[in-house]
């Protein structure tokens, strides 16, 4: 019986892509550069590839945060230290939040039935502030970031830490997330039920099979209720 729900943060509760684009544009303008849509797409490819390496345990989070802009700034010809650009970008990102549709009302409903948690490889300060600003922190019992845990999703150690801290068995939990390689793999390997949040209805051509799939948060309550 499900008692606890782990939510991924970026791309699941928060429409991170919208926030990311605006923060990039603001950072570019601050340093005299109008960043185009095409350039944002270049950044997203660089950033995504680095986070994949992080999820695979090949590089550290700090390396991701700096190296992504080291490469990107060279490509767009902006002569700014990547550490400086990253700092400004994160400050702006902290102030921005765009919720995925139906998140607030769904969390409010689910919080009356389950214990809700956030599990993320995101930055601790950023996540905590965004949850507060988005008025979601009231529904969330605890936040587990890779920074706090010392391991990152999808590692077994990350989820073991979470389960131990909430005193729960794997079959009492479900993880809801948009990443097959991070959220769903981590849940499967930890024995946790998995729900793939797939709002863009992307085809799953991998061998990673979640227990359930939703494209709208409004369907989550019934989906979890219907689990065996």
Outline where the language-model segments fall:
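Asp-based, Mg2+/Mn2+-dependent phosphohydrolase catalytic module
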Residues: 1-5, 17-18, 29, 80, ...
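N-terminal helical cap/lid subdomain that shapes the substrate entry/recognition surface
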Residues: 2-101
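Short, conserved clusters of charged catalytic residues that mark active-site
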Residues: 101-102, 157
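Catalytic-core regions built around general acid/base machinery
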Residues: 102-113
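Glycine-centered short loops/turns at secondary-structure junctions
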Residues: 113-114, 191
